[in-house]
Amino acid sequence: MEATRNLVSSSPSFQTKTHLKSSYSSPSSVVMLHDQTTTPVVNSRHLNSLSRHFPASVLSQEPREESRPLSHALRDDRTSQLTLERRQFDELVSSREDEKFEQQLLHSTGLWNLLISPLTSETKLPAVVSPLADAELCDVVALAQKALSASKQAALLVDDTEANPSDNIKDSLSTSSSMSLPEKGNIVRSKRQLERRAKNRRAPKSNDVDDEGYVPQKTSAKKKYKQGADNDDALQLFLWGPETKQLLTAKEEAELISHIQHLLKLEKVKTKLESQNGCEPTIGEWAEAMGISSPVLKSDIHRGRSSREKLITANLRLVVHIAKQYQNRGLNFQDLLQEGSMGLMKSVEKFKPQSGCRFATYAYWWIRQSIRKSIFQNSRTIRLPENVYMLLGKVSEARKTCVQEGNYRPSKEELAGHVGVSTEKLDKLLYNTRTPLSMQQPIWSDQDTTFQEITPDSGIETPTMSVGKQLMRNHVRNLLNVLSPKERRIIKLRFGIDGGKQRSLSEIGEIYGLSKERVRQLESRALYRLKQNMNSHGLHAYADLLV
């Protein structure tokens, strides 16, 4: 029984769940095992934990066998008193350590599944009790070696299980192992844990499911906003910040609007002072005009501006909802969001709480009006009036209706009938609302040929037309030879032939000293003679060249 008691007090590999952590977390337990084989010292902490699992017969035999050697020891009062005091002290210390260790295990959620399951299947305490009860002192060394091998196996299992654990489990293991080490004996610090931590820091963390079934939680909203936004995503940049996700209650909205109304009153007084004094008033003058102190004025201004910003930010999603309805109408999505924001800010200034509706209901129409107005003015190179846009919208709706009915290519007459206008007005509308193209725009995406390179210039005559006009001029000069010199000169001055400008009858009369009537008579007679000879010269071939 003496050997049994020494083995129980020294062997750390036959502990229960509460002391299983301290048995393999550090190699110091192995050092204590070899020290206690030579000098047996009872460790009350392990003895108390193991006594729970020993049979009652073994525990009852131990005091009977110990009574014989203790009967001689009781003669020395001093020795017995020291022994009792030491046992009481050890029991008190072990009870406190047990309570601390149990609290640590309760806070560490994954320790039982990680550490206890592989060891409880290999170490069965009741199976070891029977050989330990009859063991001799010579067998203590052999049993200690077995305990040492078991502790090494446990340490290897811990190394395998700690390959992919979280940092909090590692910290709890190291903390509990350091607290459960015995105070006596040499402590050997292992560097494996430091090496594993350094290796885990260098290794990239994966988001996949771990071996224990741990699934990482989704990133919270704040973490997502801290990660940054994509510069190309206009919607993400516009709704940047968690404030845009918060909805306001009716009470909060009424409070913010009251602060904004008070700020508008302050700004109105400031504008009045500017018009009176011709310059911007100071804070003191402004506060005196309002009948309040300067600190109170500053506080009201700050509160009003922050309330206005909060109200605008909370309704930005309404701007996005309305802007999406006007996409692909000539403005990109960013411009629609900006124009809608301007309408929202204007609605904040125009809103009256006495209207009896929520702010979002009132702001909807201001946002819509601002976006529509911007489309009318800026969506086209040539600005069109609003009524033309309304008519174009009706034409577009008529096309959609015809497609839904099965007519995928409606004629102009059918569209005019759906819209309620004439065909001529529809043609004029479609002609005036054509989208102009840039002459520098490439015709094909894979080539650099532009419209300017292939579009002919209507101001430049073709070689065929130029030669035809030259022949016509020579033919006309030959035809004028049938007239008298005076008539020929009057015709040339009257119609600007040979590069001259056209002259009036009075100007020609002044040149020849004739009246206007006489010049007209000469002109009529000359034209009549030309008509008589035109058929014989074949001038009808030049009819296409006359403009």
UniProtKB/Swiss-Prot annotation:
Residues that span the membrane, as ranges: none
Chain positions of motif Polymerase core binding: 335-348
Gene deletion effect: Chlorophyll-defective seedlings with reduced levels of chloroplast-encoded transcripts (e.g. atpB, atpE and rbcL). Delayed light-dependent chloroplast development. Constitutive acclimation to light stress. Suppressor of FLU disruption phenotype; seedlings missing both FLU and SIGF do not bleach when grown under non-permissive dark/light conditions.
DNA-binding feature ranges: 505-524
A GO biological process held by the record: cellular response to light stimulus
SUPFAM superfamilies: Sigma2 domain of RNA polymerase sigma factors, Sigma3 and sigma4 domains of RNA polymerase sigma factors
Domain of life: Eukaryota
Gene3D superfamilies: RNA Polymerase Primary Sigma Factor, Winged helix-like DNA-binding domain superfamily/Winged helix DNA-binding domain
Subcellular location: Plastid, Chloroplast
Record keywords: Chloroplast, DNA-binding, Phosphoprotein, Plastid, Sigma factor, Transcription, Transcription regulation, Transit peptide
Outcome reported for the amino acid change (mutating S177 to A/D): Chlorophyll-defective seedlings
Biased composition (Polar residues): 1-17
Induction: Induced by red light. Slightly induced by blue light.
PTM-bearing positions, type Phosphothreonine: T249
Effect of S95A: Loss of sigma factor activity but green seedlings
Tissue expression summary: Expressed in seedling, accumulating progressively. Present in leaves but not in roots.
Chain positions covered by the region annotation Disordered: 1-28, 54-79, 163-226
UniProt main location, coarse: plastid
Modified residues (Phosphoserine): S94, S95, S174, S176, S177, S180
GO MF term list: DNA binding; sigma factor activity
Quaternary structure (record): Interacts (via N-terminus) with DG1 (via C-terminus).
Family of this protein: Belongs to the sigma-70 factor family.
Protein name (record): RNA polymerase sigma factor sigF, chloroplastic
Organism of this sequence: Arabidopsis thaliana
Lineage: Eukaryota, Viridiplantae, Streptophyta, Embryophyta, Tracheophyta
Underlying gene: SIGF
